[in-house]
A protein has these predicted regions:
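Terminal, non-globular segments
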Residues: 1-188
């Protein structure tokens, strides 16, 4: 993106600030939803962290993944930092995959959301239930973990749309279109 004037720089700074404020407002709302209700609710912060990672660089992605992971730990009563490490790793991986290989398509997000959510639910089950060899521990995976996984995937659709709605007017253009290049060259 070519920025010519200080006015354009101020507009870019303003849009970026508003975009990040809205991102973290969504994160806070999802945290509130996760802390209320019953045991069977989606882990909303996983799709939020992944959606934010799709559109940003590695550093913003790892920070957002860590913050969302800490909030998951707080809302679920897990070991502090457990989900932060998992989400920080996956947010870096998702950011790099979208930067290097994938296009920003809905199906790509849904597949990645399903995979990351499953891995997170599986690790949660493995380290909090199966490792202690409780009786009938497989029932917890089938009746609790898998339902939470499905709810998380379904909620990913709505979160993707919300983040897309935020990004549409506020995300800076990374490339100039042919028309913009022609208009720029005509002015010179």
């Amino acid at each position: 993106m070519r920025i010519k004037s200080t006015r354009e720089q101020r507009i870019l700074t303003f849009k970026t600030t508003v975009r990040w404020i809205l991102y973290y407002l969504v994160v806070f709302c999802c945290f509130i939803i996760m802390t209320s209700g019953t045991l069977l609710k989606p882990i909303l912060l996983v799709p939020v962290a992944l959606c934010i990672s799709i559109n940003n660089n590695m550093y913003a992605s790892v920070f957002t993944g860590a913050v969302c992971g800490f909030l998951i730990d707080i809302s679920c009563g897990k070991l502090f930092g457990y989900n932060a490490v998992i989400l920080a790793f996956f947010c870096i991986a998702v950011s790099l995959m979208y930067e290097l290989y994938l296009r920003q398509r809905f199906m790509n997000f849904m597949l990645i959301n399903a995979a990351v959510s499953y891995i997170q639910c599986r690790l949660d089950y493995k380290f909090y239930y199966q490792i202690w060899e409780y009786e009938d521990v497989d029932r917890i995976f089938v009746h609790v973990s898998m339902k939470v996984w499905i709810y998380t995937i379904i909620s990913g659709v709505f979160i993707y749309l919300i983040i897309k709605l935020i990004n549409k007017p506020l995300m800076p253009k990374t490339h100039l279109t042919i028309e913009e290049v022609i208009k720029t060259s005509d002015r010179s």
